[in-house]
């Protein structure tokens, strides 16, 4: 397995702002790879297959499970979601920072595969703000939104398993915080080859 210190997991309720912050990181840090999730749900307005998600049928997804193509997968709101293995391993080999936008279930599984991954939980200040955002998004029925709020509260119970928490109340401030977290990944001491660094320092070639 390749260096897993370059993994950044963003998780939290739908509507908290994970996608916005992920896009911001991709704009600010050139050497990144966004792990595109595969899902069986229908595309929302404006979503493009291969850009926002890999949209597949339930049959195709189940075939992927049988073939061991996913690092993790889960059923969320009656739809399958999963993280493909090969693109992630390729990006790590190339030394890129790999960014995940996944739910709490996926976070728990990924941390078993990549224990050194850095994880950030992103949330709103309270459930009323989250509800307002979901209503404004206009992609879910009121019944679905209520289910999302119930699920969001369950996810909040898992906060202790994350490294960082961002209350996304001020978007510009949240952008600053997530960027500072991402930048620290390339300087985490455990990610370096100490023997190589020491030899290079002694030979004055570093």
UniProtKB/Swiss-Prot annotation:
Keywords: ATP-binding, Cytoplasm, Kinase, Nucleotide-binding, Transferase. Gene3D superfamilies: Guanylate Kinase phosphate binding domain, P-loop containing nucleotide triphosphate hydrolases. ATP binds at residues 12-19. GO terms for molecular function: ATP binding; guanylate kinase activity. PROSITE patterns: GUANYLATE_KINASE_1, GUANYLATE_KINASE_2. InterPro entries: GK/Ca_channel_bsu, Guanylate_kin-like_dom, Guanylate_kinase, Guanylate_kinase_CS, P-loop_NTPase. It catalyses: GMP + ATP = GDP + ADP. Essential for recycling GMP and indirectly, cGMP. This is Guanylate kinase. It comes from Helicobacter pylori (strain ATCC 700392 / 26695). It is an enzyme of class 2 (transferase). One of its GO terms (cellular component) is cytosol. The gene is gmk.
């Amino acid at each position: 397995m390749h260096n897993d210190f370059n993994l950044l997991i963003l998780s939290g309720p739908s509507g908290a702002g994970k996608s916005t912050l992920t896009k911001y990181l991709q704009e600010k840090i050139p050497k990144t790879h966004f792990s595109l999730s595969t899902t069986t749900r229908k595309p929302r307005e404006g979503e493009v297959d291969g850009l926002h998600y890999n949209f597949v049928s339930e049959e195709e997804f189940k075939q992927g499970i049988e073939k061991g193509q996913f690092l993790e997968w889960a059923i969320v709101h009656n739809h399958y979601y999963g993280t493909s293995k090969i693109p992630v391993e390729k990006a790590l080999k190339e030394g890129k920072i790999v960014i995940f936008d996944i739910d709490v279930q996926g976070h728990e599984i990924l941390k078993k595969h990549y224990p050194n991954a850095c994880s950030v939980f992103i949330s709103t200040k309270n459930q009323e703000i989250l509800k307002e955002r979901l209503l404004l998004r206009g992609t879910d029925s009121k019944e679905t939104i209520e289910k999302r709020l119930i699920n969001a509260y369950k996810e909040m119970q898992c906060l202790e398993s994350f490294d960082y928490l961002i209350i996304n109340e001020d978007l510009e401030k949240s952008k600053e915080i997530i960027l500072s977290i991402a930048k620290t990944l390339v300087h985490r001491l455990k990610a370096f080859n100490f023997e190589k660094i020491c030899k290079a320092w002694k030979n004055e070639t570093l």
